[in-house]
């Protein structure tokens, strides 16, 4: 015989799981919310692999980055507000312009978007 407390605990656990699941949203890849997730991953990657980014910059001096990204890398507080307003094309250019985009950044961005319940559609 199953106790009512067991059933109640099971229902509560299911309800908590449903409440904790993020809502899903489908957005354009150029949506600012998508860009902010991408830039958050990018800033974290720069922090984790700073020497690699310095070497890339030295080898490609014509590659420029928005000043907001540099400020966010070295500001260890909440940097997301610094990154608003960067045009989507510029976000795409800087993120996809590094050789490790497909092996390290793209999977991390996909994971972060999915974790936030965001899916993108083609423009």
UniProtKB/Swiss-Prot annotation:
Residues 1-20 form the signal peptide. Pfam families: SRP1_TIP1. It comes from the Eukaryota. GO terms for biological process: fungal-type cell wall organization. GO terms for molecular function: structural constituent of cell wall. GO terms for cellular component: fungal-type cell wall; fungal-type vacuole. Keywords: Signal. Belongs to the SRP1/TIP1 family. Seripauperin subfamily. This is Seripauperin-16. It comes from Saccharomyces cerevisiae (strain ATCC 204508 / S288c) (Baker's yeast). The gene is PAU16.
